[in-house]
């Protein structure tokens, strides 16, 4: 079966933020996972099943901290990568909150390519940890919608708040 379709290529320039922290990988990983808890998926399933109003979703959407992020997904590739010859501790996450994503989604569902945010941690050779994340606003401006771009700047601020809660410096790119 073939479908009629058109395509376009949208060049995107993204700022990747890398923070090298003088803290062991496991210490930062545990702190991150305590600060950005897993999404309570069962609670959201119940809200949908019960026909809850949007206000109930908003109240359940964010975490309990200043940044309001929760973890939607996480992956620990280290064991498999070790078999492949690279013994480097690593963890990847998708983080965000539904309330912020919904404000962008109503303008362009394509925001889901960038929300939730992808964040990665890995050990470096000096015994520290590298935290890597793409700057949200630099991704979201590619959708060419001012409301989405403004929310991207808000996500920059929230990401900076998270980094500070972890005891890391707020990068200049996240100081708007």
For the regions a protein language model found, what residue spans apply to each?
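Feature detects long, helix-prone N-terminal segments enriched in hydrophobes
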Residues: 1-176
């Amino acid at each position: 079966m073939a479908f009629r379709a058109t395509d376009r290529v949208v060049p995107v320039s993204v700022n990747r933020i890398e923070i090298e922290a003088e803290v062991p990988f496991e210490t930062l990983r545990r702190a991150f996972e305590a600060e950005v808890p897993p999404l309570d998926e069962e609670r959201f399933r119940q809200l949908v099943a019960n026909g809850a109003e949007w206000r109930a979703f908003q109240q359940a959407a964010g975490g309990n901290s200043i940044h309001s992020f929760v973890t939607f997904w996480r992956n620990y590739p280290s064991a498999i990568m070790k078999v492949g010859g690279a013994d480097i501790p690593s963890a990847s996450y998708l983080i965000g909150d539904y309330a912020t994503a919904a404000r962008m989604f109503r303008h362009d569902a394509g925001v889901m390519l960038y929300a939730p945010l992808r964040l990665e941690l890995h050990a470096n050779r000096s015994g520290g940890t590298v935290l890597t994340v793409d700057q949200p606003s630099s991704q979201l401006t590619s959708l060419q919608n001012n409301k989405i771009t403004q929310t991207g700047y808000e996500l920059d601020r929230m990401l900076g708040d998270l980094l500070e809660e972890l005891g890391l410096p707020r990068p200049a790119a996240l100081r708007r």
